């Protein structure tokens, strides 16, 4: 290596010397001569400075080559970096433009959404202002509020009237006592009643401060009481009242016989309490002592007391109701004691008050009194003065008066309108009347007592038997059926005689005033009555039973279970299956009664098929075409390609919404 390097260095030096000599022609010759001389004289020259210069040149060349290589590498890398930077810059620009576009689109979408929301709010506000349902609910609430307020005002008004009774001759039909009346006319008991009523009015005014709770059934209960009257008229429920001690008092008061000193004030509307009392006062009568002493010293047993509570009593609201025959509206007939000899009067204290007589009934307007055993009633009430009335009203107690209160609390009527029809069923049944009837201006009936009729009065004689009248009508209407007499057997006659003792008793009573008929005539009449009963009652009842059985069979019909085709369902709807009624006929005849319990769900599913077919018929198609259409809907292919039919239940489910 060193030899090669030395040779290379020598060659470079020779090249350098040659280049120098070429620069000067004269020098070339001189140099060559000198070199030759030197070479001959010095065979191995060793210059010391040449190796140092050669090493530095080599280092510079290597360094420069390395620098150049590095520069090339840097240049390539810069080029690559520039390209990458350009790519990144382009992507940033693209993303920036995309973000700007998104912002712009978002702003436009926000504006559109805001405008739509504003329109929707405006529309909702318009709907809320024009919604008929909201208006209906508002009107309903207003109506309920108005009804409640008017009801409360009316109750308050009625309560005020109960505390202050307006005693007017024009409205109530009796003379109004004035402050100038003599105390002897009123009597000590009457003034004691006024004082008691004043104290009770104060107590009731305190009780009226309780919180009122509206009873939703109150309107229904009061409907009978206000059926014929207007809202401005006052209901005068005036009840006949008796005192256990024998003295007659004003309605609803406990009179005292110990007070003999009259109070020095006159009767005014402000200190008179209404006759409408609580039912609790009637309950207090049940707590009477076992033996009650009457005014004449006799002792009333509990049996007589209870009998007195059950005795009938009649009330007349005012003179107007008596003039227009309000009693006749309820068919209250008194054949034995409403005649010329047995007068019905309204008695009074004193003899100077006016007396009226209308239709054989003597009416007077006065305060109450017990006059020589006659029962008197205050406030325009009917008074019965004869012995027959004593027997009816008193029974075994010989007309001893009892105190009866017949007004419900708050004036509520407990039953509905069926009471009037129930009362009409018992018309012309007088006998021993056990009616507790209160006649008001509105012709209402107090509902707490159910009318019952006893065939015999207290004298033991039949007064007016509805059955006997009905049988007498049968005699006049069935005179052409006498040929049926011989067709009945004696056994039937004897059986009827045992069951009809009451009718035989009626035929023998002196009240009928008929001569005793022969036995054959009575038998013929009885057989005629039996035939009449059979033709008019038993046969129609059998016919009704057959109709009811047919109706029950129709109502108990069950829809066909799991029908195989739509045609079967339609046939059942139109004509019926196996003689059973058709579904359409049942709907037209009974409505939904036949399917309320048993066929409710099944019919609701079948109804979709019925409606689908009927809609097609309305559009001009036939029932068969609609049935075929439904049957085609049932066809489908399974996974093997076979054609099968879906169930009727699937078909009914697919028709939901029709």
Curated annotation (Swiss-Prot):
Annotated signal peptide: none
Residue ranges that the Swiss-Prot or TrEMBL entry lists as coiled coil: none
InterPro entries: HOT1 (IPR052146), TF_GCR1-like (IPR022210)
Keyword terms: Activator, Nucleus, Transcription, Transcription regulation
Main localization category: nucleus
Biased composition (Acidic residues): 407-421, 485-504
Cellular localisation: Nucleus
Biased composition, class Low complexity, residue ranges: 33-55
GO molecular function: DNA-binding transcription factor activity, RNA polymerase II-specific; RNA polymerase II cis-regulatory region sequence-specific DNA binding
Keyword Cell inner membrane in annotation: no
Pfam families: GCR1_C (PF12550)
Compositional bias of kind Polar residues: 434-443, 455-467
Role summary: Required for a complete transcriptional response to osmotic stress.
Family: Belongs to the HOT1 family.
Protein name per Swiss-Prot or TrEMBL: High-osmolarity-induced transcription protein 1
Source organism per UniProt: Candida glabrata (strain ATCC 2001 / BCRC 20586 / JCM 3761 / NBRC 0622 / NRRL Y-65 / CBS 138) (Yeast)
